[in-house]
Amino acid sequence: YTEMNTKLIGREKEALKLEQCLNSQRSEFVAVYGRRRVGKTFLVRSVCNDSFAFYVTGMYNASKQEQLINFAAAFQRCFKTEEIKVESSWILAFNSLARRLEQLPEGRKIIFIDELPWMDKAKSGFIPALENFWNSWAALRDDVKLIVCGSATSWMISNLINSKGGLHGRLTHRVLVEPFSLYDCERYFTHFG
């Protein structure tokens, strides 16, 4: 638990677990989940020091096409490409992401997908594409840190943690972020006044 994360009051165990994943010598697939407004995104951004190779946040109540446009805009922002290229499917979007990540210098590549459940629309092909991205590319490397986050706890549990499909047993770590205890609330308000 590093000095730069001392602002994470009440999240010491969660921060330590994320740091261990970031510093491991293998690819990691981490699910961070818990109720809305408990600090999941802040935790990930703080521990990772905002040093993401790719970072996208799913859009609430958006269509598959809108989600793909959002993914393409994040791609352009992260990789500073000239134009936004919107892929027609999630398979193609994740393939483009893998190709671009392969062009980066050696070293860990942190991919943060926030509000992941919002990206999975009925018949969108999102989960099979994510499975393919992890199983056929990221898991075969030793430098990918795929961190997914979501407030839809039941979705995270059924589709990732207890997955019966292609992601069965693929998560390397899961981090449950719970609301502050009274003790942590007291520490927080004492520290930040």
What is each of the regions a protein language model found here?
Residues 1-193:
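Phosphate-binding site recognition
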